[in-house]
Structure formats: C-alpha cells, structure tokens
Amino acid sequence: MPTVPRRTLAAVGVAAAIGVSACGGTAPPPAAAPASGQGTWTWTDDRGKNISLPSRPQRVVAQSGAAAALWDFGVRPVAVFGPHRLKDGGRDPEVGEVDIAKVESIGNVWGEFNVEKYASLRPDLLVAGMYQKNTLWYVPEESVQAVDQIAPSAGVQLSGKPLVEIIERYGQLAAALGADPKAAPVVEAKNRFDAASAALRTLAAARPDLKVMVVTATPDNLYVAYLPDHPDIKYWGELGLNIVHPARPTESEGGFWEVVSWENADKYQADVILVDARTQSMKIEEMAGKPTWAKLPAVRAGQLYPWHAAERYSYLGYAKVMEELKTNLEQARDDVVK
C-alpha cells in the first residue's frame, strides 16, 4: 500500500467526517486464551526482529488495521492507534469489527500517538503493519525510541507479499498470542474467503473484456494504482480480472501509483473505476468537479465503485470485499470503453 498518497491522505483525514459504514456480520471468534502456566514466548517479526518475553503477551496494543486483523482471528487488543473513530463517534471502517467501546485509544489520526497513555496501559506488545521496510505504520518517527523502551513491537510486512501470505501471517501471530486457529468463526471466514475468490474467478472468466482501474485522489492529483505493489489488486489480477494499470509507478512518489495531473486524468480508461473509500480520501462528489475526470467513460456511465484500500488483512475482511466487488462488477457494462 502506498506511503504517498497514503501518508498525504492520512494527514488530510484529520478533517474528514464522512466514512464508509463498518460491516457487521459473522460472530467473533473467542478471545485468545490466557497465558497461565506458559513459559517463554518468542516471535520473529517481519523485520527479522527476535522478541522474547517471559510469558505470552496479554496486553496487546495495535495499529487499527493490525487490530482489526487480529480481532478477526480472536485476539482482543487493549488499545488501538490509527483511524478507529469517526467524528460522529462511529467506528471507522479501518478498524474492522473491533469494539471501540472496549479498547483504549492512544491516537486516531496521522501523527497522533500518546506515548504517556501508551506507557500507562502497561503493554506487553505493540503490533503494526509496515508498508515501508522496518517502519511501523502510524508510529510517529519522533516517538519510535520512546515506544521501543516501553514494550517490544512486532511488525507485519504489508507490501511486496501476496495477499494470502499476509493474511496467514496475521493468523500465525494471533495463534502465537493464544487465539484458536480452528475456532468456528475463523474456519467459516476462510471458507467464505475461498468461495468469494472462486466466484470472482468465475466472473472474470465470463467477462474478460470488462476493464477495471483502481484510483485514489487528492485535490492536486489523481493516483492510478500500480498492480504489482498492491496485494489485493494483484490477487484480483491473478484471479483473472482485467486490471488497467501503469507499466511502472512514479518512483519519486514512493511507488504504488502513477501520479497523474487532473488535466491528464484521461491517460488511462476503463469500464469500471474503483475509488479509494477511506474516510480521508477525496470523495467521488469532489472529484466530479474535475473536468477531465468527469468526461471519463466510467464516470459518465456511473460505474464508480468503492475500493477498500485499508481493508484489514483477514479472511473475513477480504471475503466481504470480494463479495461486494463481484456484486458491483456483475451489474457493470463492459462496452463503456470503445
């Protein structure tokens, strides 16, 4: 996932008030078992960092996306940081099905991490994803040293790896933290993910001419997703979806995207455009004011659908995403681009 515009959008998100409703659904898996009688707990994270504790961590603090993934696997963090509460008090989609009434908050927007409150929670472990190697997402650079002195951290690499491998990695960490990988909700979610993947593969095979593009935007630029850098989009391409994407990303912007000015927003065209649905992203209604964008075939045809760019890496999370995607693509025309 991108650092730019992800980082840019994170900053913009301070003022965002509109969000995508969080989904309800499957009963949650049982909480991870306590560590009574356990010996030394060890874990090697995706930085190659070896963590060794006297017993299994009980008090886990996690970035919202990591918390959401762990929650689906049965781990109950004591606190979260990163987007989790909307301005109206509702749950931000980025935190998945985490019960935000039952967890502490140590930061809700980019750059916000209350180190003093974090320390007061007596954490055993901090968990966060990493889009850039060795950089924990939403842990401010200026706070890293202080955070590291309070408790060890475990990073999960979210770029440069296949979608399923990232999901499995969160599952492995959850199991190490005491969650039951064979709990009925976890097994049901895996089956649902497999079924959604198969259904999307069938749709792709039946509609090879349906062209799909994925974008995000800021007031200054349109960002067209570069397929190889996004685990979810790459997975859909492997299932057979006809993804329109740049030949290479804009390297000066950190990869992940080709950055296109709004005047050149018609450089790539597709029958369907999936638009970043994060609360901090530029909204479709706002993008409508950009003349070149408004003339795109998919825009004129009304074939704009959400892309859940910050979906949690769990079977349940991506099962829901692919079910929604299949429903949207089924109703889309494949002759919009001539």
Q: Where are the predicted features?
A:
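Bacterial N-terminal signal peptides that target proteins for export
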Residues: 1-12
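Structured C-terminal subdomain patch of bacterial secreted/periplasmic proteins
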Residues: 149, 165-166, 264-338
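Extracytoplasmic ligand-binding site segments that recognize negatively charged/polar headgroups
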Residues: 86-89, 132-142, 156-173, 209-235, ...
